[in-house]
Amino acid sequence: MSITATDLYEDGPAAGAKAKILLIHFDGAIDAGAAGRIAIGQMLRSLHNERVATFDADTLMDYRSHRPIVTVDDWVSSPDMVMPKTVLDLVEDDMGNPILVLHGAEPDAHWESFTNAINDICKRAGVEITFSLHGVPSGVPHTRPTPVHVQATDASLLPAGGAKITNHMQFPAPLSTFVQIRLGQRGIGGLALLGAVPYYMADTGYPAASSALLTSLAKFADLSLPCLLYTSPSPRDS
């Protein structure tokens, strides 16, 4: 059975939203220190947001990799399972600037069809550029400021003199990168912001990288964002 873009999502209250920026982050993708996830959570907690679209998990997810969460009380299973969810929200920064935020569980299947759906929404909304947020393991110590590296779909989007880990890399692409590349081929450029996370903090929450990502996003996109997060000391400080 063929899948059309509109089969993959259900419109929300803000379905007709207009925004020049699409921000992408999926749980389960490349994100050392949960840097991107914490940053997105900070935005959603601190800023006004409305639902634009909810994507069909039954079509996009492999439930063996995104298992529903069930609660059992006194040996009785609750019917209210927490299902994996991928959504698109309209978020307004502190100055009222609109941002489309695509977040939630990373879909397992139908990436091309999913991207077609995102492209259609972007065209209607007037999106001009995309950003994605990631934490990447690095040799940087936690006592240093967190550098943010920038990956782009076009060389013209790269900042002059920006920090670079290396000039050549190959890695299995997360869906955020896949979407940005496909949208780039259709005229919507993309930047991936990569916050450096100490290797020894990669498997735990590292808010310092999240703050650095939000600060970089605010700078590149000219947004007013809640960039300051509480950063607990590393266990190695004690």
Feature map (PLM): residue ranges:
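Internal, conserved structured core segments that host functional sites
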Residues: 97, 105-156, 179
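An acidic, glycine-/histidine-flanked metal-binding catalytic module
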Residues: 223
